[in-house]
Amino acid sequence: MTRRSSGYWRVTINHPPLNIFGPYLIPQLNEAITAIETDDQVKVVVFDSAIPGFFLTHYDFLAKVEDPTSLPPGPTGLQPLLDILVRLSRAPVVSIASIRGRATGVGSELALACDMRFASREKAILSHFEVGAGIVPGGGPMARLPRLMGRGRGLKVLLGADDISGALAERYGYVNRALPDGQLDEFVDALATRIASFDKRAISETKRFVDVASLPPDYELAPE
């Protein structure tokens, strides 16, 4: 995590060679989210990747099964990954995913938990492949995707289990905007810098009202 300024932070995912999500990343993400929640100056945080071709991919199936399941629930009472995603969505800070490369499974779920998503038109690939592998997504995309793109398109993404390009993600509403790859970093940095120049209370209160009207409740993210 780097601080561009007191109000503008970046969380850069750097787990070579493929940025595969696994139990070892949960404490690191939790530490980042806790810092974002508790710092009284940060206003905007950008999530990006240091690994070419990969934003964040799903999942390290070679990790011991007991590793993630042995972790206690987080402050929300939800399982650790879902707890982190819910807290990110509700944090009094603007979160932006800058997607270049593959954002699959958990990578997509992290992007969906952010307030805004911007993608490389040429290099971003978003996907929920889980149904094709015989598993059910666990990070709440069934509640988030239909709110962004409608029920039919949400089901297409989840049940089609196929890659979605940056350009198609923009058409679907999966991301706010897909930009030419050479413009992505400059655009996101300019937006984050602009937001960070505004009053923190105005930012957090505006976001809170939008959250009340738009975020899924916990029981939709983790149905029994």
Predicted regions and their residues:
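Well-ordered beta-strand positions
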Residues: 110, 116, 156, 160-162, ...
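C-terminal long alpha-helix characteristic of the crotonase
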Residues: 119-124, 175-223
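CoA-thioester-processing core
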Residues: 84, 98, 104-158, 187, ...
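Glycine- (often His-adjacent) and acidic-residue-rich active-site loop
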Residues: 49-87, 103, 134
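Hydrophobic/aromatic residues within transmembrane alpha-helices
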Residues: 47, 60, 110-112, 169, ...
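Structural motif
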Residues: 91, 98-99
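Conserved CoA-thioester-binding segment of acyl-CoA-metabolizing enzymes
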Residues: 1-48, 52, 86
